[in-house]
Structures are given as C-alpha cells and as structure tokens.
Amino acid sequence: MSSWGKVRFFMLSLAFTTALGSKLPAQAQAPRYDLLLKGGHVIDPANDVDKVADVGISAGKIAAVAESIPASAAEKVVDVSGLYVTPGLIDIHYHLGHGGSPLNWFAPEARSQAGPLGVPADLALAAGVTTVVDAGTAGADTFLQEKEEVIDHARVRVLAFLNIVADGMNGGLEQTVDQMDPQLCAQTIRKFPDLIVGVKTAHFWTEKPWDALHPPWAAVDRAEECGRLANVPVMFDFWPRPERTYAELILKKMRPGDIHTHVFAQQFPILLPDGKLNPILAEARRRGVVFDVGHGAGSFWFRNAVPAVKQGFIPDSMSTDLHLGDFTVLSMTEVMSKFLAMGVPLEDLIRRSTVNPAKEIRRPDLGTLSIGQEADVAVLEELHGHFGYIDDGNARMNGNVKVVARMTIRGGRIVYDPSGLSMVEWEKAPKQYFTTPQLGSSPPAKADK
C-alpha cells in the first residue's frame, strides 16, 4: 500500500471509530464524576463564587463548578436544591481527646480533675467542619503521642498549634516557665511542618502574685520566640493584669499574623465605659493582628459581642474551642448561627469559616472549591423560626435564623449525611437490602452496595 493509501486508511478508520463511539449508549461511557452535587447555592469566597451551580467531584478532588452539569456525567448524584454548598469549614480552635500525660487536662484518665477535657476529632464533621486545628492540647513532649493516637486515624483533617509548654495543656505544668522552651518548640514544629501550623500559649499565672519564677510576660515572650524561630503564627489565650495589659499585648507584643482568640471573653476591655468600641482594636488590626472567636465554655459574652458587632467589629475567624465542657451545646454551625442572629450575613460568615482561617494558618489549599483541590465540602441549610442562643454567662439571646449542616464531604467521600440526602428511599432499595442474613454469615450489603 502506498503512503497516501496508508494515510487514507488511517483517516477512514479514525472517522469510523469516532462515529461508532458517538452512537454508543451513554451508560457505556465511564462517568466523568464520582459525585455530583446538583442545584445548590455555591458560596466559595476564595473564588468569589456566590450563585446556584453544580459541583462535580472526581478522585477525591474538585473537578468542576458549573451552572449545569448533566446528571448522566456522574456515578452518584445528590440533589442539594435549596441548600448552600461551601468549602468544608475550618475550626482553628479545637481540643482533641487523647492519651496525653497523666495530668493532661484533655486526657481521658484525667476526668476527675476540674477543667475541660478534649473531644473526638471526628465530632466536628457533624457541623460541616473538614479541618480542625488542635489549639495547644499537646506540646513538644506530647505531640507525637497526639499524632499517633488521634491525627493519624481521624477522618477529619487535623492540624495543630503546639503549646509552648512542652507537656501541653497540663494544669500544673502550664505554670512552670522551665517547661516553656522556645528552641524545643521550634524544633518540633520543623519536624512536623505539614501538621503543626503555629504556637499556642494559654492559662499562665492568671491570679497569683508575680515572683522571680513567674514574670508577667514569660509565656507570651517565649511563645513569640518560638514563633519567630519556626516562622509560624502564635495563638494567644490571655488574661490581662495590671502588670501585663491588654493594650500592650495587641499593640506591642503580637506580630502581624498572630491570633488573639477568645476575643469576646469577659476579661477584655473591647468596649469603653460609654459602650463604644475600644479604638485599640482597630489599631491592632491595622498592625495585622488577627481576632478569633474561640467561643468555649467561658470565653463568649453577648454583652461584648453584640455591641461590638453592631459597631462593625466582627472577628476574622469563627471557632469553637470545643471540649467536653461545652460540646453538648456548641458546634461550629452554632457559633456561626449566633453571629447570623446578630445580623452578620451568611456569606460573610462562610468567608470567616473557610478562606480566612485558611490564610491564618497559611494553608491556602484549604477553605476553597478551586478545581484540583481536595474535595472538602459542607452542605448547609439556613433555617428560619424562633431560636434561643446562650453565652458563657448563662444569658440568652433570641434569634430568628439558624444554620445547620446537612452533609459533610471529606476528600471526596460523604462522611456525614444524617438526613440521607445521598441515600435511596428504603422502598426503592435493591434486593440485598431486604435480605436477612443467615446466622454466622457476613452482614447483608447495604442499600448502596
């Protein structure tokens, strides 16, 4: 066959194959997406997306965000019409329950001690959270144990602020300055750069008289030194006293990018006697100081939050400070709902629960629905009615709006779906669903198997 004949033969073969392929039934072609969320209102502040659109997920990654993706292109389709589809929420103030040291506040064996205790990492999934940041539960001497016992096994992504105290959040040792070794702290952070995103200091010498072993700024200064050595931000849980003032902390001690958590706690003078917002907050923000909610069981007062929000001061990030002392009444969506009831728009709250905290911990790959990024997704619903919200002073605020999580997707897998959005109605379930297993045999397949 001549060269021209070979070319003609190849072209005819290609045309025949293309024509044949175009006539193959759709089911013979492999679906482009493993999962398709269809008809939801997508809010992705990182990409300035705020519209009704479909989200396609493939191989655990965001594969498409478009106004209309055919259902035939997906192996599984979930109708999320009337719901919000957002990046997975990020809770940057969380406390993990793990073995820890014998005196660790958050250790299971320490339940007899006064004080809060850590909670399971995956509890966060029920609030649309796909990333939690442990806020100093572990220090340099206990982080490896936390990693092996919790981080390595959690479905939710777990990152951490390393406590400047080597033993971690441990009541007595938190008051021991010799436990605060900036070099050891920085060395540990460098050893786990993919997991440890910053430093945490908390609870140091809040009441007792100062002495040579307990200088006022010891914990703050040593945490800052570790932050400088490791080039990471510091999160501050702080109690002001005459010798270490709030103004000095946020206007002099804290660096740009450092995080002041518990901003609406009772001890901070964020309001002047006349009720106006303390101008040092705006000054600190201009310096680059970050303000975080860190709600917790003792760090959120409506008497501070409501007037501040009305005057335009909204924390940069939402967070829970979740532990056994508050988990029965608190979650990430509950924190968001309180601010929603104060008049903060949902779109703004999603920004402060996704892209903002991602920037604070220097993880721009998180808190986004960008194509190619890991498919961490929250499906939320805004409810309207009569709701009561409580603060840590046992006071109530009434509201008429609330946000709840309806589905959580972590790395492309549905890990929370309490209403069965992704499930078949039981009457339409396949045959194996109705099969009773024989004694001693394997369990029957589920409706989606």
Give residue spans per PLM region.
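Active-site core of metal-dependent hydrolases
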Residues: W205-F327
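Bacterial N-terminal signal peptides
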Residues: R8-K23
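Divalent metal-dependent hydrolysis catalytic cores, especially in the metallo-beta-lactamase
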Residues: V119-K147, R155-G172, F192-P209, N231-M235, ...
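Divalent metal-coordination and catalytic microenvironments
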Residues: G40, V55, G60, G82, ...
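Metal-associated gating/positioning segment near the N- to mid-region
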Residues: E75, V80-D152
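His/Asp/Glu-enriched, well-ordered alpha-helical/loop segment
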Residues: R303-H384
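Histidine-rich, glycine-flanked metal-binding segment
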Residues: A30-L35, V42-G88
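C-terminal cap of metal-dependent C-N hydrolases
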Residues: G40, E374-K428
